[in-house]
């Protein structure tokens, strides 16, 4: 089996009916189509634009509770603090707006392939690159001010459509996508689980009292206020938590492993509307 066929073969094993060609000739575009088709088939009564709501798209009981929480969302303070941070000048008199001239509504520009650096550029990484370029200390990546900044940016970006690109003229971009894909399907930890075990093959089923959320929609609503955390947190904080739940060692937030994973997973979610920040259990 070729590396391009890995995702499609996994979807076949998970029970998907794939309206595309042989698994040995799959492109990222074909893999994306198969990924999205799998979830539409698995949850035929869920409108496509509802997948951005995660578990709440497939579980009416938890959705009712979530809608009640959204009446007075716990992330409102983070949005306000993030706006203040965005508008506060650095010591040199410059600010985030000087690095991001399009304004704060830039969530759908990331993650992206940075040809000059030869790596996946995420929004948190870009925010810290802006800070260090102006002599500021970089922010920590899991929570705190970075989550507040992201909450404000996400709020300003609501309604944008996920649109990650894999440049065809730079094989390094495809390699990063492939590495992210392999991370997603690799077993790890004492429990020997992969991301796909919970969020693809058994999505929608119960694990103890929790409904396992579908991977289609996983990247639309970050950062989130999780009741379990009692505060805002970033996507890479959640990646680390998932690794730890299967008793595997977590990787560094914004390290290559998680950035490539984000690149792959966000590409799989292309076409979905961004609706962050979010609230989760």
UniProtKB/Swiss-Prot annotation:
This molecule's function is given as:
C-type monoheme cytochrome, which is part of the SoxAX cytochrome complex involved in sulfur oxidation. The SoxAX complex catalyzes the formation of a heterodisulfide bond between the conserved cysteine residue on a sulfur carrier SoxYZ complex subunit SoxY and thiosulfate or other inorganic sulfur substrates. This leads to the intermediary formation of conspicuous sulfur globules inside of the cells.
Assembly and oligomerization: Heterodimer of SoxA and SoxX.
> What phenotype is described for loss of this gene?
No oxidation of thiosulfate with a simultaneous deletion of soxX alone or together with a deletion of soxB.
Q: Name one GO molecular function term.
A: oxidoreductase activity, acting on a sulfur group of donors, cytochrome as acceptor
Reproduce the UniProt comment on modification after translation: Cysteine persulfide at Cys-242.
* Residues where substrate binds: 238
Q: Signal as a keyword?
A: yes
Keyword annotations: Disulfide bond, Electron transport, Heme, Iron, Metal-binding, Periplasm, Signal, Transferase, Transport
Natural source organism: Allochromatium vinosum
Keyword Signal recorded:
yes
What gene name does this entry carry? soxA
The stated induction of this gene product is: By thiosulfate.
Listed binding positions for heme are 195, 199, 242
Q: Where is the active site?
A: 242
Identify the residues that the record assigns to the Cytochrome c domain, covering every copy.
Answer: 175-281
Q: What is this protein's name?
A: L-cysteine S-thiosulfotransferase subunit SoxA
Annotated signal peptide: 1-25
Cofactors, names only: heme
* SUPFAM superfamilies noted in UniProt: Cytochrome c
Enzyme Commission number(s): 2.8.5.2
């Amino acid at each position: 089996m070729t590396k391009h066929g890995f995702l499609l073969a996994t979807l076949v094993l998970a029970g998907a009916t794939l309206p595309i060609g042989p698994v040995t000739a799959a492109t990222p575009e074909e893999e994306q189509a198969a990924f999205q088709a799998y979830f539409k088939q698995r949850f035929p009564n869920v409108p496509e634009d509802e997948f951005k709501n995660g578990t709440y798209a497939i579980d009416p009981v938890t959705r009712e509770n979530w809608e009640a929480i959204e009446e007075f969302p716990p992330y409102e303070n983070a949005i306000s603090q993030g706006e203040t941070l965005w508008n506060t000048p650095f010591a040199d008199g410059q600010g985030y707006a000087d690095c991001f001239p399009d304004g704060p509504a830039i969530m759908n520009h990331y993650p992206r392939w940075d040809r000059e650096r030869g790596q996946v550029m995420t929004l948190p990484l870009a925010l810290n690159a802006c800070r260090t370029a102006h002599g500021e200390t970089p922010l920590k990546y899991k929570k705190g001010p970075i989550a507040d900044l992201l909450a404000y940016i996400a709020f300003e970006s609501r309604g944008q459509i996920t649109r990650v690109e894999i440049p065809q003229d730079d094989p390094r971009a495809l390699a990063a996508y492939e590495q992210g894909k392999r991370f997603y399907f690799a077993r790890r930890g004492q429990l020997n689980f992969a991301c796909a075990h919970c969020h693809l093959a058994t999505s929608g089923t119960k694990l103890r009292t929790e409904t396992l959320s579908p991977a289609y929609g996983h990247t639309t609503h970050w950062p989130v206020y999780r009741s379990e955390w009692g505060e805002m947190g970033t996507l890479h904080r959640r990646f680390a938590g998932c690794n730890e739940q299967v008793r595997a060692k977590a990787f560094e937030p914004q390290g290559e492993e998680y950035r490539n994973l984000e690149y792959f997973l966000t590409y799989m979610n292309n076409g979905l509307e961004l609706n962050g920040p979010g609230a989760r259990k």
